[in-house]
Design a protein with these regions (language model features):
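Short amphipathic alpha-helical segment with a characteristic S/N-K-E followed by hydrophobic residues
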Residues: 17, 32, 55-60, 70-71, ...
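Amphipathic alpha-helical segments used for helix-helix packing
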Residues: 63-64, 96-120
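Tryptophan-centric aromatic hotspots in well-structured domains and transmembrane helices
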Residues: 52-53, 121, 125, 164-165
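Hydrophobic alpha-helical connector segments
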Residues: 62, 72-104, 155
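Hydrophobic alpha-helical segments that form the core
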Residues: 138, 147-169, 179-186
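Short hydrophobic/aromatic patch on the recognition helix
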Residues: 43-53
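Amphipathic alpha-helical packing segments from all-alpha helical-bundle domains
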Residues: 102, 116-142
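Basic, helix-initiating cap at the start of DNA-binding domains
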Residues: 1-41, 58
């Protein structure tokens, strides 16, 4: 007898595969995220993987983006400045304490010539973080924590740019302390 809920089964399989791919990418990078390893960890066949994803790169990228995007949480009922600091520090920890840093550098480089990767980075990594940060900025403006004339879009770029600058160029150490210092300098300007 067939599964009475095939859509649920499909969602469960996709979830298991993406979880496995994300874990493998964070544990050992793209080299660890082979189709065999993903299938074994997810408990599915390689054929099932190819049913939903055209390549190892596609499933690994989607799994990594999903895992990386869920790697942060914010303090509850905290001032906007504190939550913004935690958001940026969480990204720095991910980049410096897991293989995500070198992976993200490679993905950003590849995104310059591969639209699929650029879209995945924007949709699954940047936009979710920017949306959370934008809401925090708006809350800070509404509560009087930040200046009323704040340009949210420009501030979002200022918030994250120092992290990506150090991640991509490596001219100085990227560390949680650097992120905290950078954010605190920015917050001083936001308060006016």
């Amino acid at each position: 007898m067939g599964d009475p809920h095939p859509r649920r089964r499909t969602e469960q399989v996709r979830d298991a595969v993406l979880t496995a791919a994300g874990e493998l990418m964070l544990e050992g990078g793209l080299a660890a995220a082979t189709m065999e390893a993903i299938a074994a960890r997810a408990g599915v066949s390689k054929r099932t993987l190819y049913k939903y994803w055209p390549s190892r790169g596609a499933v690994a990228l989607e799994g990594f983006m999903r895992s990386a995007a869920s790697s942060w949480s914010l303090p509850e009922n905290a001032p906007a400045a504190e939550s913004l600091e935690e958001l940026v520090v969480a990204a720095v920890r991910l980049f410096t304490q897991t293989p995500a840093g070198p992976l993200m550098r490679s993905l950003i480089a590849d995104a310059q010539s591969q639209d699929e990767i650029a879209t995945a980075i924007r949709d699954q990594w940047l936009r979710p973080r920017r949306a959370v940060a934008a809401e925090l900025l708006r809350q800070g403006i509404a509560s009087g924590e930040f200046r009323a004339d704040l340009d949210v879009e420009v501030t979002l770029d200022l918030l994250f740019a120092p992290v990506y600058y150090r991640l991509l160029l490596g001219h100085e150490t990227l560390s949680p302390q650097f992120a905290v210092t950078s954010i605190r300098h920015l917050i001083t300007g936001l308060k006016g």
